[in-house]
């Protein structure tokens, strides 16, 4: 797995673990902040019409223990079977069941083009437990970045601009 390093300034080194969040959580490490996207239904082999994804979320959220008590979850609702599966609502419910509260919402607009099969935006949900500290509580709510990179053949990967903004704010 790839581990990325970047420097905020000359006095502090920040490490970004660019890997499966479950892998990171299994290690005995301290981490300040979580920025991740839970796997989609199909990545887990889950039927979206069942409650299995919510059960996965409950078991996963309970493992998050960032030292700054902030976690940002990026998720896109899914279109299928002639309906929209509201994954962002399920994420909010799972965090609230685990004692977190929704602190901030952002929307990443991926494109203004019409797409009959995919949502053209992503919900970026920041959750908190007290005490917590946010560097910029007045960050913009809507971010437009149409330059999604292609990662391992998957062309709807996270925007580096959005990731940078979230990390720098928290």
Region spans (language model):
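Core catalytic lobe of class I
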Residues: 1-170
